[in-house]
Amino acid sequence: MFKAFATIGFVLASGAAMASSYEVCDQPFALCAASSSSSTGRTIVVNGISYPEMVAVCPVMHGPAVGDTAGGNMKGSCANPGSGQVWSLYQPRKNIPQAPNWDPKTPAPYRTFTTAAGAGLSNMFSFSCTLTKKVKNVQLANCYGPADETLAGTPVPVGTKVITQAPVGASYPVGGPLP
């Protein structure tokens, strides 16, 4: 687990991401670290750059989690984004409920992959999510964020090494580039 904390800490503290405002938010949140995503067919603008918008179905967890109050669409605060909504935040976990069975004991090991044309990543970190349904007592949320965008709000080039907890074969897994 220390290796996971160290890796995530290194990613969060690297490069341009250092200028962001990371805070611990203690509230319900969507944990998208082990989710895949699919295109909505729309675009989303981050720091003046248009990206393809992706949607990920993510389990809602409780407790302290890290958010970037200057990133995503958090607008400076951990305050709830609205009625029926939560933020997509990050909390290291060995097990994360995942589609299709949403079993809370599903292992979610860290893995890396290299992006390729048409096989990138999605960034849901610190974007708002809409609560949907419960499956096997796990509350789910639809989270919307950009494809191939870094934590610092810049494009991810093809050939970038990425870390994720999504299973091998996941479409546009939620993750972040390694420095």
Predicted regions and their residues:
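Bacterial N-terminal signal peptides that target proteins for export
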Residues: 1-8
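Mitochondrial intermembrane space
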Residues: 20-179
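N-terminal signal peptide c-region/cleavage motif recognized by signal peptidases
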Residues: 14-16
